[in-house]
């Protein structure tokens, strides 16, 4: 008997910030493909856990029997695009999420990242509340695969500039 499940597989490889940005589009993908299960294969699965729009999350390199379970003989749509390599991103004409929308065939509606805390996280959320807004600076993209040094002038903010921002 053949599996009648339909799948959308979205593969995201990159840093935590890129994965968090990807959370902005999970609801849009499910809206476009309501009859399909959304399967994520990502480098930071913790950003996608508890997301009600996702049916299954796998860490890159930790998806045994994935081909047999989701691809071989199945009705599947696979998205494995690199939005950072798109002209409009490189030339700073469009935001990362907007470029992803183009690649995924989704209308850009200024979607925002969505993190869904689990039960334990919800119970401890008060520990993070402050009387004023919290700003997070992610000054480095991290080393690329095979990169000799951890700093890359094309991806990382110089430490001196990051330190000045923190001071003010």
Question: Model-derived features: where do they sit?
Answer:
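Catalytic machinery of carbohydrate-active enzymes
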Residues: 1-168
């Amino acid at each position: 008997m053949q599996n009648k499940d339909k799948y959308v597989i979205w593969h995201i490889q990159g840093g935590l910030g890129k994965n968090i940005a990807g959370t902005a589009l999970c609801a849009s993908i499910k809206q476009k493909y309501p009859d399909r299960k959304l399967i994520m294969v990502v480098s930071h699965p913790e950003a996608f856990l508890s997301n009600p729009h996702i049916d299954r999350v796998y860490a890159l390199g930790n998806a045994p029997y994935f081909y047999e379970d989701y691809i071989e003989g199945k009705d599947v749509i696979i998205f494995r695009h690199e939005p950072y390599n798109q002209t409009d991103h490189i030339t700073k004409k469009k935001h990362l999420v907007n470029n992803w929308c183009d690649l995924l065939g989704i209308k850009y509606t200024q979607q925002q990242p969505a993190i869904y805390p689990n039960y334990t996280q919800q119970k401890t959320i008060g520990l993070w509340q402050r009387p004023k807004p919290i700003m997070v600076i992610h000054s480095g993209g991290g080393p690329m695969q095979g990169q000799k040094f951890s700093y890359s002038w094309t991806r990382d903010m110089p430490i001196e500039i990051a330190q000045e921002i923190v001071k003010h």
